[in-house]
């Protein structure tokens, strides 16, 4: 394969992996440990 193709595939795969990890962290099991500053601030 050509070098440019491999670089494009690597960058695309990295972006997809990062996006998947970010969504898992935001909405998956680890999201239970995140704090919500709006709930901590009682009006």
Swiss-Prot record:
Q: How does the entry describe its membrane topology?
A: Single-pass membrane protein
Q: Which UniProt keywords apply?
A: Chloroplast, Membrane, Plastid, Thylakoid, Transmembrane, Transmembrane helix
Q: Name one GO biological process term.
A: photosynthesis
Taxonomically, which superkingdom? Eukaryota
Task: State its location(s).
Answer: Plastid, Chloroplast thylakoid membrane
* Bilayer-crossing regions: 5-27
Q: Which InterPro entries match?
A: PSII_PsbN
- GO CC annotations, alphabetized: chloroplast thylakoid membrane
UniProt similarity note: Belongs to the PsbN family.
Q: Which PANTHER family does the record associate with it?
A: PROTEIN PSBN (PTHR35326:SF3)
Q: Describe the function of this protein.
A: May play a role in photosystem I and II biogenesis.
Q: What is this protein called?
A: Protein PsbN
């Amino acid at each position: 394969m050509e070098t440019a193709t491999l670089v494009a595939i690597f960058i695309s795969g990295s972006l997809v992996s990062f996006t998947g990890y970010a969504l898992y962290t935001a909405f998956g099991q680890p999201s239970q440990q995140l704090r919500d500053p709006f709930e901590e601030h009682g009006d």
